[in-house]
């Protein structure tokens, strides 16, 4: 009886450990006690207070808040574009808060796609070239072909060879979004990505992003 009970206890413990490992491995991003303060003159303005966040692979979350509530600051922190005043950020089981800018940049380049409401396209590059450049810099095979496939999904097949100045605001934003996900990042951070789009295009972009996450 003792040996059976002991075996049961050991098995239960092993199962519990195994489940915890699975849960930990499936966590893509983790924030622990994140605080962010900006200093303006003699005052410290607190933007984020004790933020805890867990995002699992293939999970979609929305951060809702008033203007100035810190949503964009949160994206900047997660994307490694800014450092927290205190707290820790883990990406794929690696703490990134203590890494150098170059190390964080390397992680971001390969694993994180950021879509800002305000974006920049290279003026003298066509739509295809703007997207393909990201792939070229990361040694993708056939970057032009991949860029065209992606832009086609965004309804821009007829705009492949147009410069940004020849595109509407909504079309420019679609190019910027296509560029952000061209590397097939593990994590997409979107700061009001459809803010400049009409209803029809907003729905199309949202559906594409959700489909991408499921894939």
Where are the predicted features?
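Helix-to-loop junction immediately C-terminal to a conserved catalytic motif
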Residues: 79
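The feature captures the beta-strand-to-loop junction immediately N-terminal to the Walker
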Residues: 64-66
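Conserved signature/switch motifs of ABC ATPase nucleotide-binding domains
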Residues: 109, 162-165, 183, 214
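Conserved ABC ATPase signature
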Residues: 163-167, 171-173
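Short coil-to-helix segment of the ABC ATPase nucleotide-binding domain corresponding to the Q-loop/switch region
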Residues: 125-133
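Conserved ABC transporter NBD signature motif
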Residues: 87-95
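Catalytic Walker B motif of ABC-type/P-loop ATPase nucleotide-binding domains
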Residues: 188-191
């Amino acid at each position: 009886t003792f040996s059976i009970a002991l075996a049961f206890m050991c098995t239960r413990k092993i199962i519990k450990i195994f489940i915890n490992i699975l849960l930990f491995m499936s966590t893509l991003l983790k924030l622990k006690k994140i605080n962010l303060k900006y200093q303006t003159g003699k005052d410290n303005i607190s933007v984020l207070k004790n933020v805890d966040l867990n995002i699992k692979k293939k999970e979609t979350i929305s951060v809702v808040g008033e203007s100035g509530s810190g949503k964009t600051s949160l994206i900047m922190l997660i994307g490694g574009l800014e450092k927290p005043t205190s707290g820790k950020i883990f990406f794929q089981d690696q703490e990134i808060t203590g890494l150098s800018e170059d190390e964080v940049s390397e992680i971001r380049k390969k694993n994180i796609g950021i879509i800002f409401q305000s974006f920049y396209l290279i003026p003298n590059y066509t739509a295809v070239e703007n997207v393909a450049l990201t792939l070229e810099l990361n040694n993708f095979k056939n970057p032009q072909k991949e860029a065209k496939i992606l832009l086609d999904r965004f309804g821009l097949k007829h705009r492949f060879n147009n410069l940004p100045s020849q595109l509407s605001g909504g079309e420019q934003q679609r190019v910027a979004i296509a560029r952000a996900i061209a590397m097939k990042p593990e994590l997409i951070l979107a700061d009001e990505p459809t803010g400049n789009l009409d209803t029809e295009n907003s729905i199309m972009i949202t559906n594409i992003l959700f489909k991408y996450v499921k894939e």
